[in-house]
Design a protein with these regions (language model features):
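Loop-to-transmembrane helix junctions at the membrane interface
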Residues: 66-93, 99
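Hydrophobic transmembrane helix segments
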Residues: 21-63, 90
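Cytosolic juxtamembrane helix and N-cap/initiation of the first transmembrane helix
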Residues: 1-32, 130-142
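Alpha-helical membrane-associated segments of multi-pass integral membrane proteins
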Residues: 23, 105-139
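Alpha-helical transmembrane segments
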Residues: 18-29, 56, 79-89, 112-122
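Juxtamembrane loop-transmembrane helix junctions in multi-pass integral membrane proteins
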Residues: 10-18, 45-52, 71-82, 104-111
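Alpha-helical transmembrane segments in multipass membrane proteins, preferentially the mid-helix core
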Residues: 62-74, 125-134
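Interfacial non-cytosolic loop connecting adjacent transmembrane helices
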Residues: 40-56, 94-118
Length: 142
């Protein structure tokens, strides 16, 4: 029987990175949120992932989050810290904007949809924290 080990300092597969898993959960949360908004008639298909979205982030923000997460885990050393910091800041902006865009507590939302509306920024905040952690690790060259 042989045991295969990775050399010290070797990176683990990208899909096992906590940041990647959290971003995948965020994408799923945005997808489900948009579908819930359309099925509940609180958003149209065109609004569900746009600037009028009540239960999902707009598509441009989702795209930026995906791109920055990929760069944060693909790049090495200090170069990876830049997209990780930007992702953390994007998540912060996303969470804060959720409180001021007029959608929070919208009268058209049921209690369950309002609960989902608070779940989305929570998932976004987790991604932001993990991105900040990734930035810190990357800036130290780990």
């Amino acid at each position: 029987m042989s045991i295969v080990t990775q050399p010290r300092g070797a990176s683990r597969p990208i899909t096992r990175e906590p940041l990647v898993r959290a971003v995948a959960a965020l994408i799923l949360t945005d997808l489900v949120g948009g579908l819930l908004a359309v099925s509940a008639d609180v958003n149209t298909w065109g609004e569900a992932w746009g600037s009028q979205a009540l239960l999902a982030a707009p598509l441009p923000m989702i795209g930026v989050q995906i791109l920055l997460a990929v760069l944060a885990v693909r790049l090495r050393g200090r170069k990876a810290a830049i997209p990780a910091v930007l992702l953390s800041l994007a998540c912060l902006v996303s969470v804060i904007s959720g409180f001021f865009d007029g959608g929070l507590g919208n009268d058209e939302l049921t209690t369950a949809l309002s609960a989902y509306q608070t779940f989305l920024p929570a998932v976004t905040a987790v991604v932001g924290v993990l991105a900040a952690r990734q930035a810190r690790r990357s800036s130290r060259g780990q």
